[in-house]
Amino acid sequence: MYLMNTYSRFPATFVYGKGSWIYDEKGNAYLDFTSGIAVNVLGHSHPRLVEAIKDQAEKLIHCSNLFWNRPQMELAELLSKNTFGGKVFFANTGTEANEAAIKIARKYGKKKSEKKYRILSAHNSFHGRTLGSLTATGQPKYQKPFEPLVPGFEYFEFNNVEDLRRKMSEDVCAVFLEPIQGESGIVPATKEFLEEARKLCDEYDALLVFDEVQCGMGRTGKLFAYQKYGVVPDVLTTAKGLGGGVPIGAVIVNERANVLEPGDHGTTFGGNPLACRAGVTVIKELTKEGFLEEVEEKGNYLMKKLQEMKEEYDVVADVRGMGLMIGIQFREEVSNREVATKCFENKLLVVPAGNNTIRFLPPLTVEYGEIDLAVETLKKVLQGI
């Protein structure tokens, strides 16, 4: 093999997909409850997304950000009007979006004081794998091989108001938070915690940054999770589902955080016409009347089925999440990797996460019968462990 050994891969090579199903080169069908890790929000090969990409590829795939392009302008308008009316910077990935947010936070602080540069983020958070976002990621297991990290970061206990309050000071320029911690095992923030984070950022003149790379783009039943909580950030990062499978990330800032000027930041590929056309299509689909309400209903249905399963199987320690972003945590005697492997062998794809958890992240277009099949398959796996 010519690929670097950076992933623990399952033994399948996929060649095509349709809806909630993905097929390997032998023709085996798998029920995909990973969505490419929260990416394929419209499922595989959604006809309107495919048509939009084909059409744009025939017109203009890429042009420099030294010029304007219509899909980029349209997507920025859609993101702004469907959030808090901010300005948008486009990147290619979630980690790129978070790196941009770090630079925005640092410049915001520097405009206030040379000493206002500290960034606070949560223990067990995940913000990306490039050096700045890795430093913001409060997980030493990812950080240790790449030390020394970027200076000026400190960590607080997630959902612990008192710890966040202790860490706040006048030299803090930003607080980074995932409204729902994804990689650490689907851990939602409490409303009280996010409300207090908002108050503290206002009190200390710091930016509140919400990383919605995984929990955004309709996954919770709202376009963005902050809309479920009613707590509005200064900076919002998104990626994954934004392109429906095409790489794209974005940062949305309010007027307060709109500090970048020409030369401060940039990207070659971010905001290219092809990716933005995909993003426009995704947002138009997600914001169609009734779509997000149905996501919430499906999420409630899935949660109910999984809670019933928890009562039936002692090895299940917890079920938590929001919308179609749900974590199933197992007791110590069962390995989440073993469960994920057995699910794979039974043609169900799930994502292992921290805290001995697997993630259910189906396409937002998943059908109720497919939800039933996924839960029944997981039950079958647990019976054999």
Swiss-Prot record:
List the GO biological process terms: L-arginine biosynthetic process
Q: Which UniProt keywords apply?
A: Amino-acid biosynthesis, Aminotransferase, Arginine biosynthesis, Cytoplasm, Pyridoxal phosphate, Transferase
Coarse class of the protein's main subcellular location: cytoplasm
Question: What SUPFAM superfamilies does its record include?
Answer: PLP-dependent transferases (SSF53383)
Tell whether Glycosyltransferase is among the UniProt keywords.
no
According to the UniProt record, one GO cellular component term is: cytoplasm
Family matches, as InterPro entries: AcOrn/SuccOrn_fam, Aminotrans_3, Aminotrans_3_PPA_site, Class-III_PLP-dep_AT, PyrdxlP-dep_Trfase, PyrdxlP-dep_Trfase_major, PyrdxlP-dep_Trfase_small
Sequence positions that bind pyridoxal 5'-phosphate: 94-95, 126, 211-214, 268
The UniProt record's further free-text remark is: May also have succinyldiaminopimelate aminotransferase activity, thus carrying out the corresponding step in lysine biosynthesis.
PANTHER family under this entry?
Answer: ACETYLORNITHINE AMINOTRANSFERASE, MITOCHONDRIAL, AMINOTRANSFERASE CLASS III
Official protein name in the record: Acetylornithine aminotransferase
Q: Which organism is it from?
A: Thermotoga maritima (strain ATCC 43589 / DSM 3109 / JCM 10099 / NBRC 100826 / MSB8)
Question: What taxonomic ancestry is recorded?
Answer: Bacteria, Thermotogati, Thermotogota, Thermotogae, Thermotogales
